[in-house]
Amino acid sequence: MSRAQLTLSSKNYSSWSLRGWLLCRLAGREVDEQMVAMNDPGNRAELLLLSPSVLVPRLTHEGASVWDTLAIAEYLNELYPDKGMYPPDRIARAHCRSISGEIHSGFSNLRSALPMNLKMRHETFPVFSGAKPDIERIETIWQECIERYGGPFLFGTQPTVADAMFAPVTRRFITYNVTLSPVATAYCETISAWPLMQEWITAAAAEPEEMEELEVEF
């Protein structure tokens, strides 16, 4: 079986890179990682030839080039339907797709207010009022899923696409010490203990201490 290539940016800062990588690993795919600095004009020009969006992640596999995290999720699910990327139940599967789409396309105030930085810890950090409805909505999503499907992941005992999509949010909450409900706090702890997340955090810690801020949507 040919290996896939996944184009990524900083593991410390890029939430979209994290999502794409988690999705590949959920599907059981080992990938060759192509790391690019998005603020390097040469890298941007090269990536433009490969991915019209000039964004990461981008998955290259057996002649297919797939960008956008949800497109990557659907592509991998087609290839590996037995890997449990989505819940087996039709209604739960629809729910999983819906909340994955919601985090993919929404919550812009949260993204701006709490950019991902895995190495940083703030004991006190002012969260501007525009981000608070986003935080409340995310807590509601998690609470409903865990109460309905039993946890500790959003759709039961095994992680799904939805957990990959929300994983960077848990790290934002931890970095900025956001006050959360007990259920949301427990979910953040579940994602932190997930072996795949631990692997990513370890790799992020090994990146250079100082990096120019990347020109991607975090």
Give the location of each predicted region.
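Acidic/histidine-enriched, glycine/proline-rich intrinsically disordered or flexible terminal extensions
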Residues: 204-218
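GST-like domain detector, emphasizing the conserved glutathione-binding G-site
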Residues: 1-128
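Residue-level detector of family-conserved "landmark" positions at structurally sensitive sites
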Residues: 34, 69, 183, 201-202
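Short Asp/Glu-rich motifs
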Residues: 43-44, 192, 210-211
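GST-like fold's C-terminal all-alpha helical module
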Residues: 103, 107-196
